[in-house]
């Protein structure tokens, strides 16, 4: 159920376009929300349908009964996809409200966000245990941010520059988290197949206040910094995994001793999003790195025996 494809109308305004949009909001407001179990069931059907569609397209001489079965899976998958999309259209509107006034109308933002939602439905991996809304929000925001750069009439900061800044910053932050120190321009360059000089140039652009405030949209109402989302430090999958890990680990912290709980919080960055090294935690407690490693190992073994063990296994092993 796409919104009216009429450009140039803000939500809450007057005229036919605004009336159509209000009608659209009323219609999607009547669509029941899904339970977590329903989301998983629909996601399974979507995955099966996509698999069946691929099989049908890649095999020339399928058994007739198998072809019928695959056709049925395709139909069921498309029905599930539609329901999963329609049940989350309100999420798109909610995200779109954060971007109003940056160069695109509410109608345009919702239209672009719906494309991101469709992509999220197609890419969603229910087996990982993520909340679909957490995962989909990243794709919706990505679609809207891209649209702001692509569709604004006056773009003085090229879209490819915005995207390159996001790529460099994303890799830089990921390497920082993995290694515990800020990577050099050479290390980032190797990862992105760029020259160190190009990486330094991009980093200078990202760090200069004037450059980050350079106008991107019309009437100078969109700045380059607006298009560098905080979430671009990680992909949708990585971010959803991080939040899921925090959610499940927090659920078992109350079963740990005070020191064990603090070690886990520091090690995984549960309090502030910044994981600490064994050395850093050792300095905080006034003990050796090896002692912290022993505490961590003992604590993780406890967590593996917890009711959430299956969900946590990918993070603790």
From Swiss-Prot:
It comes from the Bacteria. A motif (Interaction with polymerase core subunit RpoC) lies at residues 108-111. GO terms for molecular function: DNA binding; sigma factor activity. It holds the Pfam family Sigma70_r1_2. Residues 278-297 bind DNA. Residues 84-154 are annotated as: Sigma-70 factor domain-2. GO terms for biological process: DNA-templated transcription initiation. PROSITE patterns: SIGMA70_1, SIGMA70_2. Residues 163-239 are annotated as: Sigma-70 factor domain-3. InterPro entries: RNA_pol_sigma-70_dom, RNA_pol_sigma70, RNA_pol_sigma70_r1_2, RNA_pol_sigma70_r2, RNA_pol_sigma70_r3, RNA_pol_sigma70_r4, RNA_pol_sigma_r2, RNA_pol_sigma_r3/r4-like. Keywords: Cytoplasm, DNA-binding, Sigma factor, Transcription, Transcription regulation. CDD domains: Sigma70_r4 (cd06171). Belongs to the sigma-70 factor family. RpoD/SigA subfamily. Interacts transiently with the RNA polymerase catalytic core. Sigma factors are initiation factors that promote the attachment of RNA polymerase to specific initiation sites and are then released. This sigma factor is the primary sigma factor during exponential growth. This is RNA polymerase sigma factor SigA. The gene is sigA.
């Amino acid at each position: 159920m796409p919104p009216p494809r009429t450009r140039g109308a803000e939500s809450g305004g007057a005229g036919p376009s605004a009336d159509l949009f209000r009608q659209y909001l009323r219609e999607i407001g009547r669509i029941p929300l899904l339970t977590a179990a329903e989301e998983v069931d629909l996601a399974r059907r979507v995955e099966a349908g996509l698999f069946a569609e691929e099989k049908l397209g890649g095999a020339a001489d399928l058994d007739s009964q198998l072809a019928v079965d695959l056709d049925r899976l395709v139909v069921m998958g498309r029905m599930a996809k539609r329901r999963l999309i329609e049940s989350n259209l309100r999420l798109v509107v909610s995200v779109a409200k954060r971007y109003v006034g940056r160069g695109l109308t509410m109608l345009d933002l919702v239209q672009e966000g719906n494309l991101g939602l469709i992509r999220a439905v197609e890419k969603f991996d229910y087996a990982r245990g993520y909340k679909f809304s957490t995962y989909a929000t990243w794709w919706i925001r990505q679609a809207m941010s891209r649209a702001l750069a692509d569709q604004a009439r006056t773009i003085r900061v090229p879209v490819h520059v915005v995207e390159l800044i996001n790529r460099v910053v994303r890799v830089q932050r990921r390497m920082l988290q993995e290694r515990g120190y800020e990577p050099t321009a050479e290390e980032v360059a190797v990862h992105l197949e760029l020259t160190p000089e190009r990486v330094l140039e991009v980093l200078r652009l990202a760090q200069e206040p004037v450059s980050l405030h350079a106008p991107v949209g019309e009437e100078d109402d969109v700045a380059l910094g607006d298009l560098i989302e905080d979430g671009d430090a990680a992909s949708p999958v990585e971010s959803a995994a991080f939040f899921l890990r925090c959610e499940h680990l927090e659920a078992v912290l109350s079963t740990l001793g005070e020191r064990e709980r603090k070690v886990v919080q520091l090690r995984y960055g549960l309090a502030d999003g910044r994981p600490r090294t064994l050395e850093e935690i050792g300095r905080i407690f006034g003990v050796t790195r090896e002692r912290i490693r022993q505490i961590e190992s003992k604590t993780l073994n406890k967590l593996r025996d917890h009711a959430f063990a299956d969900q946590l296994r990918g993070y603790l092993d």
